[in-house]
């Protein structure tokens, strides 16, 4: 998501606050629990939508990406690493996160202000060539989360199968000689 933020700032330099730098904004995304107080502390999905409100006067690029990052952080319980015996995130939540990124990608492509201009410039035609790098980047994130959700779902199914086999094995009582 840091890469997406850099690309959005390069395409929408007016969104970067004067007192900040791209590097500072990217570093702010790396904190496991994002500070969203500059936006009034909204829920992550509200923050993504806020970037496309006509009356919003803040940093639309950061609001959009920080909302996505906050959603992803929430799915992973605001953790950056997992150890072998740790509980992993629920497959359904990871799957839902991928769908949320799809929705955000759609909003990025389609939302326009009252004068017909996009709130955030992203994909578009430049010099007669389609630049779909934003959609590709978001598609990559969606694909990674889909693959992870499938792997987690299979892990859960294996665990359920192991529990069922374990329970079935206790049907027979041990006999001594």
Regions found by a protein language model. Name each.
Residues 44-177:
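Mature extracytoplasmic/lumenal regions of exported proteins
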């Amino acid at each position: 998501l840091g890469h997406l933020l850099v690309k959005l700032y390069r395409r929408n330099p007016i969104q970067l606050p004067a007192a900040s730098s791209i590097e500072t904004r990217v570093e702010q995304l790396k904190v496991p629990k994002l500070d969203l107080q500059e936006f009034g502390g909204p829920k992550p999905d509200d923050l993504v939508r806020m970037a496309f409100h006509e009356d919003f006067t803040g940093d639309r690029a950061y609001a959009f990406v920080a909302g996505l990052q906050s959603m992803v952080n929430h799915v992973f319980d605001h953790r950056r690493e997992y150890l072998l015996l740790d509980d992993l995130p629920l497959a359904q939540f990871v799957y839902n996160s991928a769908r949320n990124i799809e929705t955000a990608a759609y909003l990025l492509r389609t939302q326009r202000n009252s004068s017909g201009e996009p709130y955030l410039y992203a994909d578009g035609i430049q010099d007669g060539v389609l630049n779909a790098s934003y959609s590709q980047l978001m598609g990559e994130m969606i694909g990674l989360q889909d693959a992870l959700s499938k792997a987690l779902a299979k892990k859960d199914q294996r665990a359920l199968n192991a529990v069922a086999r374990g329970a079935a094995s206790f049907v027979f009582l041990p006999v001594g000689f």
